[in-house]
Amino acid sequence: MIKGLERVLENTGNSGLGELRLMLEELLGGNGAKSSLIEEEMLRSQAHSARVYRLRFAIDGRVSSMIVKLVKPQNMRRSELAAKHWLPAVGLGDHGPGLLASVTDRSGDCVWQVYEDFGDNELNCRQPDPDRVKAAIQLVVQVHTRFAGNPLLGEIRMYGRELGTHFYESTVRDAILALEACRPPEQQRPLYERLLQRLYKVRDELPARAQAFEEWGGPETLLHGDLWTTNVFVIPTSNGLHARLIDWDLSGVGPASYDVSTFLLRFAPCHRAWILDAWTEEVARAGWRMPPQQELNFMFETQELARYSNRVIWPAIGLFEDRAPWGWEELQMVDQWFEDLKPVLALEPEKSATSLV
């Protein structure tokens, strides 16, 4: 038995800890090694997303570190397929999340996953290093180009999310239905009316936005779906920089611009031009062409509006079903996002796209 294993995450209130501890003992060789838990660190713990922890163990005099993550079963399946099947199928298996094992709790409501720990090599968006950013871009472009027209897209679509224009259309429709069903108190009525009008406007713009994707969106491909820099690791090795993409929980199928827009928005506007230039050069090497920046801005805006609309749904359902007190706070935050939305790329005034927002 690994010393201290019985206390792993004992004060977190998480489900499935018994199953997690048994899996950790198997992975660490608890029957033969002299081992002990030395540290646990919470990396992420939010009510509506995965809970992530770093665990460190002393094993026969050396320190071993791993990441454990509590996820919903449907998200586990996407991450598992990305790590074990999709990425290896196109020669990118060693650029994935390093999944070691998974175990479902008795209720079937959640799954623990154990991953390799890639240390503090997360991509820095505040002070971006060009070489590391380019290594990350090279990997993402490889994913996009290798999966365009790939026969696995049908499987990816079945298990993953639809992130094209259908995502925009269905998300906006669902957000409107959920919000219309709320009965706001008088003090929240201005927010309610304002947010509804924003959603109606986004819905009415669908034909023009769908047409833009028809003309400029390019082929469907595998999308990471949550390409924040916190999910991109660039690791120094003896052979140079080695990029990895973690957290494939929200992966799916759609146009490459979905991932491009998410990635660019993590950086300050002053960095986006050179990052886009690097991206344009990389896709050109693969035989693709980046759309003109005016059209890119319009597509980026469309995808951000879809993401904002998606964030309306669960607070609105919470208000409709339970009058959840956090619901109006969440909706106020989303309303402010709509208000603050600006073009991803800064263009010359005469070259700027005419926004429909």
Regions found by a protein language model. Give the residues of each.
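Conserved NTP-binding catalytic cores of kinases and kinase-like/nucleotidyltransferase enzymes
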Residues: 1-109, 235-243, 353-357
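An alpha-helical support segment within catalytic cores of ATP-dependent transferases
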Residues: 26-31, 152, 174-224, 350-354
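Active-site acidic catalytic loop and adjacent metal/ATP-binding pocket
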Residues: 42-58, 62, 204-258
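Conserved structural core of kinase catalytic domains
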Residues: 101-135
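A glycine-centered beta->alpha junction motif in the catalytic cores
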Residues: 114-127, 145, 149, 177-184, ...
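A cross-family kinase active-site recognition segment
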Residues: 126-194, 220, 332
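All-alpha amphipathic helical-bundle segments outside canonical DNA-binding/catalytic cores
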Residues: 158, 288-304
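Active-site activation/catalytic loop segments of kinase-like enzymes and analogous catalytic loops
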Residues: 253-288, 304-326, 333-341
